[in-house]
């Protein structure tokens, strides 16, 4: 038998120096599964609840001792003695134990920490790498990286409204080659920025955070970096955005306000047309959160305009939630889901969201959060679920590189069985 003998939660720090929760699940054979939970800066209002203490005298209210206590005092006693391989059953038990629609009682961070640590402990018991334990024999797809090389929006203190300007080395023949291309472009971007007298300080996700005048100027700068590295924009390397539009959408006036850059205010229709114009003029392959999370009519218009040309990713729109994803599918909105394990709060529900997307020909993009740790679980999950794409930051900061390095190891381990989709990432 492989039973759970002990579950221990503790408070550690994320990449922003804020507290987060880490959980160990220990089996009767002494094997340990350990998982640390990430945290977002721009969070969708439909996400599961990240439980924090809100005691302003400690860590400015950001401590997670309540979540830690919920694991140690409430969840652990219920699970000790359970079979470590009962992932679905245990996840459902924790969800029922919480009893709320958004995991607001125990905290999604508490439940997720246990859920991921459980899977890692089970993989140890099975003598398998995590990607193989979760994904089975068909887990062999290495994801095309979406590398965030310019940070803006809530992730940087600069004059760029859009949160992430990313490159996708779709012309690469392997994940290893894609990383080389991304690294070369990242370092050439530093040279381009320096030549313009701009800062090469980095934001939360490792991308540069220069004080560029506008969103389009940032896009042009990325293209210059691609060319400086010796690659062809639109052939070897494509461009992707995370606009995080909910961050600059005014729900009262129903206008998109580029308050950090030009000051322009756009209606939903104008915003959709803005994106269509950029897609027409630049080698853009993917737009994440191009409209506000509750602007369903705006999303419908955007999908109508460019949905057959580019990948339209719902992050705040879908929040890794099968109910919201099904709503989007029913309305023909977007064509891709961003997958963030802490948005929904359990491995079982994350897998369900990816499976629903696949059944309806929506792509899936595995993703980090801006507040990360050295935990590299999402790298294994990207392969396990054959997502085909991953978003885990730039080519700097060890909290980001930990995921990329794990994917390099997985590709090496898979050998000839490894599949890198490249330009076929949406198929």
Curated annotation (Swiss-Prot):
Supply the alphabetized keyword list. Cytoplasm, Glycolysis, Lyase, Magnesium, Metal-binding, Secreted
Q: Where does Mg(2+) bind?
A: 242, 288, 315
Binding residues annotated for (2R)-2-phosphoglycerate, in chain numbering: 163, 340, 369-370, 391
Q: Does the keyword Ubl conjugation apply?
A: no
> Any note on cofactor binding?
Binds a second Mg(2+) ion via substrate during catalysis.
Single GO MF descriptor = phosphopyruvate hydratase activity
State the needed cofactors, names only. Answer: Mg(2+)
Q: What are the transmembrane regions?
A: none
Describe the reaction catalysed, as an equation. (2R)-2-phosphoglycerate = phosphoenolpyruvate + H2O
**What Pfam families does this protein's entry cite?**
Enolase_C (PF00113), Enolase_N (PF03952)
- Listed EC numbers: 4.2.1.11
| Gene Ontology terms: biological process | glycolytic process
Cellular location(s): Cytoplasm; Secreted; Cell surface
Q: Name one GO cellular component term.
A: cell surface
Active-site residues, Swiss-Prot/TrEMBL:
205, 340
Q: Where is the signal peptide?
A: none
Pathway recorded for this protein: Carbohydrate degradation; glycolysis; pyruvate from D-glyceraldehyde 3-phosphate: step 4/5
Question: What HAMAP family would the database entry show?
Answer: Enolase
Family per similarity comment = Belongs to the enolase family.
Q: What does this protein do?
A: Catalyzes the reversible conversion of 2-phosphoglycerate (2-PG) into phosphoenolpyruvate (PEP). It is essential for the degradation of carbohydrates via glycolysis.
Record-linked NCBIfam families: eno (TIGR01060)
According to UniProt, the name of this protein is Enolase
List the source organism: Cytophaga hutchinsonii (strain ATCC 33406 / DSM 1761 / CIP 103989 / NBRC 15051 / NCIMB 9469 / D465)
């Amino acid at each position: 038998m492989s039973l759970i003998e002990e579950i221990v939660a503790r408070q550690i720090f994320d990449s922003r120096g804020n507290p987060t929760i880490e959980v160990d699940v220990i089996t009767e054979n002494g094997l340990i599964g350990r998982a640390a939970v990430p945290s977002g800066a721009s969070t969708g209002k439909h996400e599961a609840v990240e439980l924090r203490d809100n005691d302003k005298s400690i860590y400015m209210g950001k401590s997670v001792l309540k979540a830690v206590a919920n694991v140690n005092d409430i969840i652990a006693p219920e699970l000790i003695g359970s079979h470590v391989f009962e992932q679905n059953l245990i996840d459902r038990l924790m969800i029922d134990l919480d009893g709320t629609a958004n995991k607001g009682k125990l905290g999604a961070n508490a439940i997720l920490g246990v859920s991921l640590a459980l899977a890692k402990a089970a993989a140890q018991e099975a003598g398998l790498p995590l990607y193989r334990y979760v994904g089975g024999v068909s887990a062999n797809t290495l994801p095309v990286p979406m590398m965030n090389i310019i940070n803006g929006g809530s992730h940087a203190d600069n004059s760029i409204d859009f949160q992430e300007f990313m490159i996708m080395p779709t012309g690469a023949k392997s994940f290893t080659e894609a990383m080389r291309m991304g690294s070369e472009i990242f370092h050439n971007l530093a040279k381009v920025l320096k030549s313009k007298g701009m800062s090469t300080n980095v934001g939360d996700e490792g991308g540069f955070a220069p004080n560029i005048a506008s969103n389009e100027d940032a896009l042009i700068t990325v293209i210059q970096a691609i060319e400086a590295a010796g690659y062809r924009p639109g052939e070897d390397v494509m461009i992707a955005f995370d606009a995080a539009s909910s961050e600059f959408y005014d729900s009262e006036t129903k206008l998109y306000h580029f308050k950090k850059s030009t000051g322009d205010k756009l209606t939903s229709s104008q915003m959709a047309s803005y994106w269509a114009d950029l897609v027409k003029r630049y080698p853009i392959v993917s737009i994440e959160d191009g409209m506000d999370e509750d602007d369903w009519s705006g999303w419908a218009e955007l999908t109508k305009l460019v949905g057959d040309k580019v990948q339209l990713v719902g992050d705040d729109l879908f929040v890794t939630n099968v109910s919201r994803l099904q709503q989007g599918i029913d309305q023909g909105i977007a064509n891709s889901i961003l997958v963030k394990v802490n948005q929904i709060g359990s491995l079982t529900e994350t897998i369900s969201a990816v499976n629903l997307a696949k059944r309806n020909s929506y792509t899936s993009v595995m993703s980090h959060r801006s507040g990360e740790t050295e935990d590299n679980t999402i790298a294994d999950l990207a392969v396990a679920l054959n997502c085909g794409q991953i978003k885990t930051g730039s080519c700097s900061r060890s909290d980001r590189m930990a995921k990329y390095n794990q994917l390099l190891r997985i590709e090496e381990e898979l050998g000839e069985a490894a599949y890198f989709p490249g330009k076929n990432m949406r198929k």
